[in-house]
Amino acid sequence: MKVHTQESEDLQKIADLVADIGVGMMTMQDNATGELHSRPMMPLEIDDELAVLFFTHESSLYGYALDRVNLAFADPDHASYVSIVGRAEVIKDVAAITRLWTPMAKPWFQEGVGDPGLVVLRVKLDSAEYWDANSSRVIRAFAMATSVLAGEPIGLGVHKRVKTTPSWRHRSLTNRLA
């Protein structure tokens, strides 16, 4: 997966965590019932605006609200977690699909880049949170035991909230996909 350089340390941390974790869950709201539905998604790229790009079949998006989606990535072995709230847009551009194509997508899109329903789903970050302990299970278990014995908070890892800047919302799609 290609990860572009981000404009701040926190945004870069989020991009790196998502890249390291790999597959995440995307949650969208059903327009008719209001129910939330989730499915696993494998990111293809994280662009310079911390937008996450995926392949999907266009028909799988019918009936879902794309103006508010959630992406959740979890790596319990390393106590790393990311939650991204954003807006999704569908990109039908063949050049973008070709640029992002990977043989890993072949099981879902048998016809390759020419698959008639293949689109890129680009989720633009509005806000995100991450938790990262960046330590082994043994260290975390020791820290928890110490915390219980000492009666003090565990204080293990980092939790941050990040929101995008307004300037991100005005860049052209052409520049992002070039």
Task: Locate the predicted segments by residue.
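Active-site-proximal "nucleotidyltransferase
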Residues: 1-25
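C-terminal edge-of-domain segments
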Residues: 2, 116-178
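N-terminal "first-domain core" detector
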Residues: 10, 44-45
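Short, structured beta-strand-loop surface elements
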Residues: 62-127
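Short active-site oxyanion
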Residues: 48-52
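Short His-Asn-centered micro-motif
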Residues: 55-57
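A short, Trp-centered hydrophobic/proline-enriched beta-strand micro-motif
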Residues: 16-33, 69-73
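A positional/architectural concept
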Residues: 32-41
